[in-house]
């Protein structure tokens, strides 16, 4: 029997479930923490097959956005994290007591980056099916701009148990400062990912940007030699440089969509 719930009720129930799962991960041993990134996917399975039960109908799967659509969104999904994170590490290499460790071969490093992007995208799929595949389309009752901003904050809060708990994700430096910078970074990056998903109508640009973000950060961190906590403050997922750049792109995207909406309203009058 299919349970009929509005998109608003479905989305709020999903958020409760996925946050509860994230908190529940604190009770599991370190060896099980790899499941953390799959809690959004597990929440989707609960919603689609046990609660709403739309997983037994084609329409439930269509809303996930598995079809390859869009064009420029894929290029943006690669370029934006490369520039934003690359700029952060470049500032850190030149401005603080650290050292860039040149790899034996930059060509091999580029190949590693491509491989990491592919693997990172596959790893991010568990999250993106939940956030951008399932939740975002059902979150549009808030409006496009409000939903993108709120979704970014929801996504950031989902990471908090991993940062504040014993797992000590992003553990260098002052934890509360790192948490603040990380929240801003995830909110802004989330807005960008949401916009690429909504503009393209496909989950895959979101998956690609998420995977590229993680891959670029991993590769650049591996060629950075430093034990200073300033690395967390300047570069990477909690760095102020990526926060500014991701923020600028996110604000530009939101303003652009607001202008398009106003133009469509004025043309319809």
Residues covered by each model-derived region:
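Membrane-interface helix/loop boundary segments of multi-pass membrane proteins
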Residues: 126-157, 198-202
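Short, hydrophobic transmembrane alpha-helix segments
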Residues: 24-36
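N-terminal membrane topogenic signal
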Residues: 1-16, 237-238
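Residue-level signature of the transmembrane alpha-helical core
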Residues: 19, 38, 78, 82, ...
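C-terminal membrane module of polytopic membrane proteins
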Residues: 211-269
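Functionally important transmembrane alpha-helices
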Residues: 173-235
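Membrane-interface interhelical connector segments
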Residues: 163-176
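Membrane-helix interface linkers and caps
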Residues: 2, 34-77, 82, 89-105, ...
